[in-house]
């Protein structure tokens, strides 16, 4: 087609086959500033459109970039499950993909750009075994590269998974089931041909610990470094294909005004006016005292320079920030001393405590310096797990991790309510760190909700959430396979020298060159997140940072272990859940016609019952006896002990007829009490209507007299048997007036078999 340009990137995964990523432009969304379509094996298709406002937002002091991901359910051949049957607010998967796109693209735009830029990636088609997020990264980069913006792309994004000892690019869901580590890496190609890693999002899989126990390669520090190197050739191929399309169809660079933060004279004036006061303020260890002094010094700038720089107040504020950044970095690189007086490898003071909130199922408080995280765990029936209506093949989510960041955590006012993208991203990171150590559904049949409350913040609340959540889960009785801790690392690069910082503060995050978060057990990395502002980080520097993070992680785990080192007993306030396995062909009997049987069991025991398609039944109740009563009732139906002749039961009359009454002995097992036996209960008198002497719901002790070849039960009242037994030795008469005799008619007493008495599980609950 005329005006349509395309290029392919072929990814060779050896014995795992090849993946073909095709970039195309000129066919769809032609009115956007830049548009591109990315295909994965011609089965998955993502359209990205980049648009730019005509005029800059001069009043803004930040870059107004917006990234949106639109999941269309038709991409998977489905209709949305909402009431209106159309897509609504973005799913968590879509929001996390927005963040994956934003993080490498935002620093690639020229600093000072103030035109609004919007990137919209729409998932148009999705193979059920594919993941669309990395395709969206490449599509967004391609459309932005074509738009003629001041953009230092292209950016290549690739997911690599460690499967059977090999790093596989663009793995499928089925391949990830056999992977021990999963990494999304984004970067760009430098002029020297090397690849600058700009963003990493990595995690162990739910199967990692099992696979490692079976002999697979575990995700340790060396493995992660190798994975980053393995991703670089794939990124090169992707960037080369994008560049081919951009050279053929890209718009010429447009003229966009660049707003610099300050002029040189403003910086020089600020430095001369308050250099010494600012340097002294930055040596104050306490955050609140330091910020109060910084506010005073900042006010001093306005006082001294306002007249000379009238109308340029924003420049003075920007120059003040730039000078602060310079002084913080100089002190770290030259003296090895940080803002709060620590060395580069020092961790702030740590505090760990469990059971800090009454009545909740599990709670913990983790403090690292001024960062303070509350972890709260709630357990419930599996039917309470989250139902997911997204393009992800997983339809339910058993472990739910929510992260809250209220404005008071930093001593500020602000909006509270629905979670922002940052909160969703931090919660997802903490969730990924913990999923590999969670017990399976079979081992622990509970839905688990974990909430992290960041009630105090000065750096790395997401990693603090991992620590607090680990302790909270163990306090709730969740049998974690191992304890997990997290640490945030930073990096300063000045004059060819790299300095790695352990346990960074919020200010060090803002003024540093890298934010590097690592979570894991003593032996394995379970989650990792990296964002860098540099063109690239040497492999040896990254490997050193990983080792430094491991030492800090082990120190934190030691403190956590002092608070709790093994799972506690499940809280008395948490529901008790039992599991019963029944044959699949018995599920219908347990449910009963129109749910009659299962509703009856739930009503009588107070338990909640969930039935899986494979015959697994989960029983939840507020106390153990109720759950056990429900389990006994289910077993009596699906795994019954058949009544035998001579056994006695406390039964319940469930039906009356002209010839007698049917008595329920066990759920689903009724027997006939013939009218002749009912007559004996009433002195042998004639009975016109059974309903006159016996009513539905009445309790009656009966004995199984006979079981015919069809399994039908004939019953006799225990009181009749006992009356006959008393009358027989004295030659007396039975209740119907006839003398009791043996088979020969001589009236001799016959030996009776030993009887056992049972009560029906349904009726015994009411006695």
Curated annotation (Swiss-Prot):
The keyword Metal-binding applies. Signal peptide: none annotated. Residues 750-759 have a biased composition (Basic residues). Its EC number is 2.7.7.8. InterPro entries: ExoRNase_PH_dom1, ExoRNase_PH_dom2, ExoRNase_PH_dom2_sf, GPSI/PNP, KH_dom, KH_dom_type_1, KH_dom_type_1_sf, NA-bd_OB-fold. One of its GO terms (cellular component) is cytosol. It comes from the Bacteria. Mg(2+) binds at residues 509, 515. It is found in: Cytoplasm. Keywords: Cytoplasm, Magnesium, Metal-binding, Nucleotidyltransferase, RNA-binding, Transferase. Gene3D superfamilies: GHMP Kinase, N-terminal domain, K Homology domain, type 1, Nucleic acid-binding proteins. Its cofactor is Mg(2+). It catalyses: RNA(n+1) + phosphate = RNA(n) + a ribonucleoside 5'-diphosphate. One of its GO terms (molecular function) is 3'-5'-RNA exonuclease activity. Pfam families: KH_1 (PF00013), PNPase (PF03726), RNase_PH (PF01138), RNase_PH_C (PF03725), S1 (PF00575). Residues 725-767 are annotated as: Disordered. Belongs to the polyribonucleotide nucleotidyltransferase family. This is Polyribonucleotide nucleotidyltransferase. The lineage of its organism: Bacteria, Bacillati, Actinomycetota, Actinomycetes, Streptosporangiales.
């Amino acid at each position: 087609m005329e005006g349509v340009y395309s290029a392919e990137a072929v990814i060779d995964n050896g014995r795992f086959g090849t993946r073909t990523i095709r970039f195309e432009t000129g066919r769809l969304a032609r009115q956007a500033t830049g548009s591109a379509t990315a295909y994965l094996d011609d089965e998955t298709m993502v359209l990205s459109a980049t648009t730019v406002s005509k005029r800059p937002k001069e009043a803004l002091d930040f870059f107004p970039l917006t990234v949106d991901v639109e999941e269309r359910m038709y991409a998977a051949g489905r209709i949305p499950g909402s009431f209106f049957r159309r897509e609504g607010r973005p799913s968590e998967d879509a929001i996390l993909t927005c963040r994956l796109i934003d993080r490498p693209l935002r620093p690639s735009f020229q600093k000072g750009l103030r035109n609004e830029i919007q990137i919209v990636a729409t998932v148009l088609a999705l193979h059920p075994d594919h993941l669309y997020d990395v395709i969206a990264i490449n599509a967004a980069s391609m459309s932005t590269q074509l738009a003629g913006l001041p953009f230092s792309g292209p950016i290549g994004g690739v997911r690599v998974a460690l499967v059977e000892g090999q790093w596989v690019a663009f793995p499928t869901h089925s391949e990830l089931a056999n992977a021990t580590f999963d990494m999304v890496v984004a970067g760009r190609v430098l002029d020297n041909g090397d690849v600058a890693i700009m963003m990493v999002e990595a995690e162990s899989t739910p199967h990692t610990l099992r696979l490692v126990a079976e002999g697979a390669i575990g995700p340790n520090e060396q493995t992660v470094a190798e994975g980053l190197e393995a991703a670089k050739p794939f990124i090169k191929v992707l960037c080369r294909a994008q560049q081919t399309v951009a050279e053929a169809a890209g718009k010429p660079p447009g003229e966009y005004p660049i707003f610099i933060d300050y002029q040189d004279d403003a910086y020089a004036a600020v430095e001369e006016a308050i250099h010494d006061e600012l340097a002294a303020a930055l040596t104050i260890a306490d955050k609140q005292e330091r910020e109060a002094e910084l506010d005073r010094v900042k006010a001093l700038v306005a006082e001294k320079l306002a007249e000379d720089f009238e109308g340029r107040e924003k420049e003075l504020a920007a120059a003040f920030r730039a000078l602060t950044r310079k002084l913080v970095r100089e002190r770290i690189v030259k003296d090895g001393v940080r803002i709060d007086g620590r060395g580069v490898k020092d961790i702030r003071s740590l505090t760990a405590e469990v059971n800090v909130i009454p009545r909740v199922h599990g709670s913990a408080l983790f403090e690292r310096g001024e960062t303070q995280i509350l972890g709260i765990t709630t357990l419930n029936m599996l039917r309470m797990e989250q139902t997911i209506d997204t393009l992800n093949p997983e339809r339910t989510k058993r472990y739910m991790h929510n992260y809250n960041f209220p404005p008071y955590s930093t001593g500020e006012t602000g909006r509270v309510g629905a979670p922002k993208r940052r909160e969703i991203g931090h919660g997802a990171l903490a969730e990924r760190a913990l999923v590999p150590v969670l017990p399976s559904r079979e081992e622990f049949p509970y839905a688990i909700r974990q909430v992290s409350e960041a009630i105090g913040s000065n750096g790395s609340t997401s990693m603090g959430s991992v620590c607090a959540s680990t302790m909270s889960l163990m306090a709730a009785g969740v049998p974690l396979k191992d304890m997990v801790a997290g640490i945030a690392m930073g990096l300063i690069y000045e004059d060819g020298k790299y300095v790695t910082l352990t346990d960074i503060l919020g200010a060090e995050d803002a003024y540093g060159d890298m934010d590097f978060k690592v979570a894991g057990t003593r032996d394995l990395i379970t989650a990792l997140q990296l964002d860098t502002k540099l063109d690239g980080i040497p492999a040896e520097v990254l490997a050193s940072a990983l080792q430094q993070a491991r030492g800090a992680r082990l120190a934190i785990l030691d403190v956590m272990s002092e608070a709790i080192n093994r799972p506690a007993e499940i809280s008395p306030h948490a529901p008790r859940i039992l599991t019963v396995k029944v044959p699949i062909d018995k599920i219908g009997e347990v449910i009963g016609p129109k749910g009659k049987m299962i509703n009856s069991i739930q009503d009588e025991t107070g338990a909640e019952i969930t039935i899986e398609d494979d015959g697994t039944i989960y029983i939840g109740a507020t106390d153990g006896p109720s759950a056990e009563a429900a389990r006994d009732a289910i077993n009596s139906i699906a795994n019954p002990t058949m009544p035998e002749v001579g056994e006695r039961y406390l039964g319940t009359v469930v039906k009356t007829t002209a010839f007698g009454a049917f008595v329920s002995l066990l759920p689903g097992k009724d027997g006939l009490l013939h009218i002749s036996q009912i007559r004996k209960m009433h002195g042998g008198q004639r009975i016109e209507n059974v309903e006159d002497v016996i009513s539905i719901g009445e309790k009656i002790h009966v004995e199984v007299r006979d079981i015919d070849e069809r399994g039908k039960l004939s019953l006799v009242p225990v009181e009749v048997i006992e009356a006959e037994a008393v009358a027989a030795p004295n030659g007396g008469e039975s209740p119907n007036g006839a003398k009791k005799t043996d088979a020969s008619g001589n009236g001799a007493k016959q030996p009776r078999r030993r009887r056992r008495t049972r009560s029906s599980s349904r009726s015994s609950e009411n006695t």
